[in-house]
């Protein structure tokens, strides 16, 4: 859940004027194999050097030092090797055991649309997240009664089954928007299957990781139900690459 938590906190806490650092561990802290203490120390070192902004810190077993991630670009860990990655192509930034940072962090003054001050968020509405796989039976999908939108992930190439039209029609009957994620804005040719869905009313989410798209849509349906698509187009905290 680190990637989803990071995305939500990055979107919500980027304007509080303090550094916020999120982390986790691969094992419980008292396990000798755990990276908990390494991650925690790296978080403290980063806080001492950062004026504000939200970051995620985690040491992968494949890295020498803890890595500093942009929280809204963190991808879910590889389930076999437990390795976290970023969905951008920027050079990785690390923080060593002495607190020295190698690489450049994204400046917090990078142009983005700030979230309004949030004292309380009531997540009364949910978002149905659909991860496709070959032979997925769309008729078996139940849209929750409290759903405010549906987010359908596309395959890596931006394709999706034509059977998703059935789900899109059910969304239309319920008055719910259906968004397509994992689409690239610089792709001059959208595959026919995705194009069919878009021409029938699906809304594209360009250049955004799945986790951030989900967290952002969850905020949109609960905070801005009258302008969900407009909110999804805003770049709140570096989530649009």
Name these PLM-found stretches:
Residues 1-138, 145-241:
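Active-site histidine-anchored catalytic micro-motif
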């Amino acid at each position: 859940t680190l990637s989803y938590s990071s995305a939500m906190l990055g979107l919500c806490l980027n304007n509080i004027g303090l550094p916020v650092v999120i982390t986790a561990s691969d094992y419980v802290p008292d396990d000798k194999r755990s990276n908990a203490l390494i991650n925690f120390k790296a978080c403290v070192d980063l806080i001492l050097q950062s004026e504000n902004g939200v970051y995620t810190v985690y040491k992968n077993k494949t890295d020498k030092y803890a890595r500093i991630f942009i929280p809204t670009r963190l991808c879910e860990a590889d389930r076999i090797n437990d390795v976290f990655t970023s969905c951008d192509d920027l050079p990785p930034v690390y923080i060593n055991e002495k607190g020295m940072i190698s690489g450049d962090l994204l400046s917090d003054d990078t142009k983005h649309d700030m979230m309004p001050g949030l004292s309380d968020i009531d997540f009364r509405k949910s978002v149905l997240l659909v991860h496709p796989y070959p032979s997925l039976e769309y008729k078996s999908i139940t849209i929750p009664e409290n759903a405010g939108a549906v987010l359908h992930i596309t395959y890596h190439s931006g394709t999706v089954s034509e059977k998703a039209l059935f789900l899109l029609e059910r969304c239309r009957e319920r008055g719910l928007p259906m968004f397509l994620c994992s689409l690239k804005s610089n792709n001059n040719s959208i595959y026919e299957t995705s194009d069919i869905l878009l021409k029938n009313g699906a809304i594209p989410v360009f250049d955004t990781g799945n986790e951030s798209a989900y967290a952002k849509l969850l905020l949109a349906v609960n905070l801005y139900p009258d302008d969900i698509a407009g909110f999804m187009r805003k770049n709140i905290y570096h989530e649009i690459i």
